Amino acid sequence: MKKTFNEFKDFIRNKEVAVVGIGISNIPLIHFLVKLGANVTAFDKKSEEALGEVAVEFKSKGIKLQLGENYLDNLEGFDVVFKTPSMRIDNPALVKAKESGAYITSEMEEFIKYCPAKIFGITGSDGKTTTTTLVYNILMTEGYKTWVGGNIGNPLFSNIEEMKEEDKVVLELSSFQLMTMKEEINCALVTNLSPNHLDIHKDMDEYVDAKKNIFKYQEVNDLLVLNRDNDITNSLVKEAKSRVMQFSRKEEIESGAYLNGDKLVLLGKEVCALEDIKLKGMHNVENLLAAFCLVSEDASIESMAKVATTFTGVEHRCEFVREIDGVKYYNDSIASSPTRTIAGLRAFEKPVILIAGGYDKHIPFEPLAEEGLDKIQALVLTGLTKNKIKDAFDKAMKDRGINIPIYMEDGFNEAIYRAKDIANEGDIITLSPACASFDMFPNFEVRGNKFKEIVNNL
């Protein structure tokens, strides 16, 4: 039996609550907990000066602050600790807090536990945001009051009292959010799995185990959607407790969704023609097939077809920016892993000038080099990983006897100017970094917006 939110309200009232991280998602959470009668202390590495008006507002509401480099030193003595998603549960400060009797949780765990509406959870290495947005749009088109959150949209926990049982909730869930998840998710989707975030996870096994939590606590009547074309996700079928639907662009699946020549098919019925889809690339065909499966019990073929033939994509995902002197510029800043960049490269009909490099997530670049050689006419590298990427391409070029020019640039701006200088009419330039942005930018959106700003001023 699903818990009611009144139970949480009774539980949290007058509790001593620590919230770790004063970021975009936690600010509404902190305000909400105060409104519910909790005594909140907010923890953050930033200084009071760096927090600015947020710190002033918090103090005016009686919210205590623990700030600075050693902000986690005083995490003991709390009844409840809300951790940030990327904070490992074996963090020494959390271990101490738990030993002192604290209940360790996160906003997403509590939201899923008490959410009255049907939840559609989406995870995977690539395609999460596009698929989440597709599912959201299909359910909206069908006429449901639909909420979207997790990695995209707004934090939802503070809106939970506005939600009704007949509403739908669509969540994009990262491996970090899922690491400690022990809640039932009614309709779960794993788009695909490949090495990612190995800077945070101990190894690939831990990363996959985190992703499995999206379906680990399902019941027999729930739904799990898996990618048959991906070896890892296909192997998860045998671990499912719920009903399973699969999707494929390589083989027919009568009880799922598949690409049949030039038609997208769900449960034997044509949804739309391949030529009518607005999204570029076969990876987006997979995203559509996955979305169709996930909403198959809640939306009509007509709603699916309408979205499939009108949806043009999400910002920073193979996003066309402009054409200058016959050269087309694309922003694929979301591509923070080699597999994501490979998918982006496959979307183009010809080899491109690729701008890549960034923060090191300790993911191998050899797969990108091996496939990328046929899809890249020139490579412009920048960021912390530029030498690692160059080494992978140098080896692949030597092994195959192929040579593509590689340019090494110190700055992000310089990389874009270099790409412009080497491009000729008819060429395509794409920013598809294969890395996270944290060496130069707070997130991929800021990186993508900077790229667009520079390109629009060329």
From Swiss-Prot:
Gene field: murD
Classification of source organism: Bacteria, Bacillati, Bacillota, Clostridia, Eubacteriales
Matches recorded under Gene3D superfamilies: Mur ligase, C-terminal domain, Mur-like, catalytic domain, NAD(P)-binding Rossmann-like Domain
Keyword check for Cell wall biogenesis/degradation: yes
Domain of life of the organism encoding this protein: Bacteria
Protein name: UDP-N-acetylmuramoylalanine--D-glutamate ligase
Annotated EC: 6.3.2.9
Keywords of this entry: ATP-binding, Cell cycle, Cell division, Cell shape, Cell wall biogenesis/degradation, Cytoplasm, Ligase, Nucleotide-binding, Peptidoglycan synthesis
PANTHER family in the record: UDP-N-ACETYLMURAMOYLALANINE--D-GLUTAMATE LIGASE (PTHR43692:SF1)
Species whose genome carries this gene: Clostridium novyi (strain NT)
Top EC class, one word: ligase
Role played: Cell wall formation. Catalyzes the addition of glutamate to the nucleotide precursor UDP-N-acetylmuramoyl-L-alanine (UMA).
Pathway: Cell wall biogenesis; peptidoglycan biosynthesis
Location of the protein in the cell: Cytoplasm
